[in-house]
A protein has these predicted regions:
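Amphipathic alpha-helical "stalk" segments
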Residues: 1-231
Length: 231
């Protein structure tokens, strides 16, 4: 039965990824150790959900962090693979049956991972700022992977951060950032300060130093443009 399931999974990957992509997608390789790791992660998530474990419990946040780190590794750090896997999970009932990863599991992990970040931001933000972030963090969360995939592509293609395309990407990033950080420059500075000091905040973002550097150049150009020529 297990080889039949493996065959079925391989067929599914063939439907969603090109042969070239499959060669670099760790998930598509049949690796016993990786399969075992995911089996344990899913089993742990199911157990915590059965126990009605709150998303902000230490064990839930620790599991979500391990899950996201493994996911980033097994998608070869490529956010476009993540968006495709999400679509594949939503469209293929057999995928959910074989992996045991249900929409409820994903929801639990997403919330627990968010709580792990909110716990850090709580050290930098005041009560009002934190309440705003907590209230709005999930508003546009699902838009991030597609944006990060576009940022990776722009960086890979060596697009000029100050170009029209670069500025459009910077505007999209700023809109998503402000959706949970608000528009107060003083508050936004607290987020930037925290992100520079707390490695955990960069986990599960699929952002590399090169992509981050490109984005900083693009947002810098956007800010200069918004300020207009110096008087």
């Amino acid at each position: 039965e297990s080889w039949l399931q493996t065959l079925e999974l391989m067929k599914m990957y063939d439907r969603w990824f090109s042969q070239q992509e499959l060669q670099v997608l760790p998930f598509a390789e049949q690796d016993e150790q990786r399969n075992q790791t995911w089996l344990e992660l899913v089993s742990e998530a199911q157990q915590l959900m059965r126990q009605r474990c709150p998303a902000d419990a230490p064990q839930a946040m620790a599991l979500a962090t391990r899950w996201m780190e493994q996911l980033e590794q097994d998608t070869a750090g490529r956010p476009e693979f993540l968006t495709r896997l999400n679509e594949m999970h939503a469209a293929e009932p057999q995928m959910r049956e074989q992996t045991g990863v249900t929409p409820e599991t994903i929801d639990f992990i997403t919330h627990a991972f968010a709580e792990s970040k909110l716990a850090i931001w709580a050290r930098y933000l005041n009560a009002e700022e934190l309440a705003f972030t907590r209230q709005h963090y999930f508003d546009r969360l699902m838009e991030w992977p597609a944006l990060v995939a576009d940022l990776h592509r722009a960086c890979r293609e060596k697009q000029d951060p100050a170009s029209t395309e670069g500025q459009q990407l910077a505007q999209r990033w700023l809109a998503l950032f402000q959706s949970y950080a608000g528009t107060d420059p003083h508050t936004q500075q607290k987020f930037r300060y925290a992100m520079a000091r707390e490695p955990h905040l960069m986990k599960g973002t699929w952002m590399t130093p090169a992509v981050l550097s490109w984005l900083q150049q693009a947002t810098g150009a956007l800010m200069r443009q918004a300020q207009g020529p110096a008087a």
